[in-house]
Every structure is written in C-alpha cells, then in structure tokens.
Swiss-Prot record:
The lineage of its organism: Bacteria, Bacillati, Bacillota, Bacilli, Bacillales. It comes from the Bacteria. The gene is ykzH. This is Uncharacterized protein YkzH. It comes from Bacillus subtilis (strain 168). Residues 25-62 form a coiled coil. Keywords: Coiled coil.
C-alpha cells in the first residue's frame, strides 16, 4: 500500500468515480428492499423460534391412558 505511507489522507482523498444517472435512487431502492427483506427474515425467525418452543413443550409432555398429560422433566 504505497499510497498509505505517502499520503496521510488516503483513502479519503481519492476522487470519486462518476456514477450513472439514477444511481443514487437505485441504491436507495435497493437498501429499502434489503430492509424489508431483513424485517421479513427477522419475523420468520421469530415464528420459527415460537414453533420450536411449542414443539419442545410438546415433547416434554407424555400422554397417559388415565387422566391426561404428565409433564416430564429431563
């Protein structure tokens, strides 16, 4: 990294490459889409976690022939 040693402002003083027209709006739209997908993913994880908790609770219960279910602690 030759530039780092010779220039204390590196890489912040590098000229920006020209961006195509509409590039900023495309970037904003992509970020908004990513934000929506992240929210959907977080919600899906929450639903999955709740399902796993329910399954674990059901596995901890043993149905008997008599008066209902018995909670079994492991």
């Amino acid at each position: 990294m030759k530039n780092q040693k010779s220039n204390t402002l590196w890489p912040f003083d590098l000229p920006l490459a020209p961006q195509p027209e509409g590039y900023q709006q495309q970037t904003i739209d992509r970020l908004a889409g990513l934000e929506l997908r992240m929210k959907q993913l977080i919600r899906a994880i929450e639903v999955n976690n709740e399902l796993l908790r329910t399954m674990q609770e059901q596995q901890n219960r043993v149905c008997t022939n008599g008066s209902g279910s018995v909670i079994v602690r492991m």
